[in-house]
Amino acid sequence: MCSQVPFTTGWVPGEPVPGEVVVYFADDPRRLYQLHQWLPVFELLDRAHPVLVVTRHPQTYAEVGRLTRLRRVCVPNLAELVQLYGDGDIKAAIYVNNSVQNFHSLAATRMIHIHVNHGESDKVCMASNQAKAYDRVLVAGEAALRRYREALIEFDERRFVPVGRPQLDLRPEPVLPPTARRTVLYAPTWEGENAANNFTSVDVHGPAIAAAALALPDVRVVYKPHPRVASSTDPGVAAAHRRIVGLVEEAARREPGAGHRVLINDDILAVFRGCSVLITDVSAVGLDFLYLHVDKPLFVADRRNNRAGLNAEAPVSRCADVVDAATVGSLTGTLAKRLARDAYRAEREAMRRYYFGDPAPRESTKRFLEAVEEALAARQTWDRRPLAPSAQAP
């Protein structure tokens, strides 16, 4: 319930709702990272169309207030959500995930519903049949379209709009201080909600990856796992995470000037800056790095030890060195080799175009804003349509 916070900010039932576009986020703060990365983009949208962040959880509501200047409300139950939507003239709702509670909002018939997701990756969850519930689905590029074509029955491509990745137009201040050392970033994903979406390398290869990176001379090693790795309840993941943290912290104590560090809640885009090479899993992190730093080597870990399957399901692995049971033992040498000679630069550039197109700087943001404008115009056209004779009262 939201009894400990105002029902809304700057609005009470019966007064105008302060928003033309809703950003709907129903989950608790553990998933807030999904919304967080979009907030600067939504702040740009707010300049043309007032944006209202609708939350369903009181702690999320409070945290959103610390993250953005956007207006926000907390509506803990369905009756209050229906009242909010009924009292306002909200033209569109935007969704950043596939939360089951999205369907409470999707019941509203006088808004156009836009799904944007919270990243671009080759995880199974990125091509959910839930996409059919939305009027528009904004995707990064051709790879996302292929993913949906292959996964969905009666896929209607007309509702899917490639826009790139607007979040990657942002340039956050770097988290890491300058160093003369080369920086190896290990940024694994979490274990997912089920086995099909479990791509983490933490419990399978994580300690070996950290040890291999730390064995390189003259490097700074940064461990930046997905935030949900640090809070994982999976015994294997939790134990391996503690082991990796211990390895990095022990190396930092032995060599204080090296700059080895563990980062948990920092913006991964800000961590990228200053890194020389990335080791990651099948996740949005690797693709974001590919887009922003196509000139730097990339390693992709495979917990399933199925190279053919990985190459088929995660095409980015074709332009990267793969870390699996067969290669993790020689990882130190492979890292040294890639830092000395980058063998996959041309392949990464081609793969970048496949996933994201070839947008100019800030072009993705422009495409996103144009896609929202088009959706709002479509809604306005629908609103003004004449009723068919059969639908009119006698």
Give the residues covered by each predicted segment.
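Conserved catalytic-core segment of nucleotide-activated headgroup transferases in glycan assembly
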Residues: R31-L45, H49, L168-L247, A360-K366, ...
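A short, gly/pro- and small-residue-rich
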Residues: H104-D122, V202-I209, V294-N305
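N-terminal pre-catalytic "stem/leader" segment of glycosyltransferase-like enzymes
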Residues: M1-G86, W382-P394
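C-terminal amphipathic helix plus adjacent low-complexity
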Residues: G329, G333-P394
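Short acidic-hydrophobic, aromatic-tinged amphipathic segments that line or gate anion-handling sites
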Residues: R72-N77, G164, H260-I264, R318-T334
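Active-site and donor-binding regions of nucleotide-sugar-utilizing enzymes
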Residues: L32, E43-L44, P50-L170
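Catalytic binding pocket for nucleotide-activated donors in carbohydrate/polymer assembly enzymes
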Residues: A284-F356
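Donor nucleotide-activated moiety binding/catalytic core segment of transferases
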Residues: V237-I279, S283-L287
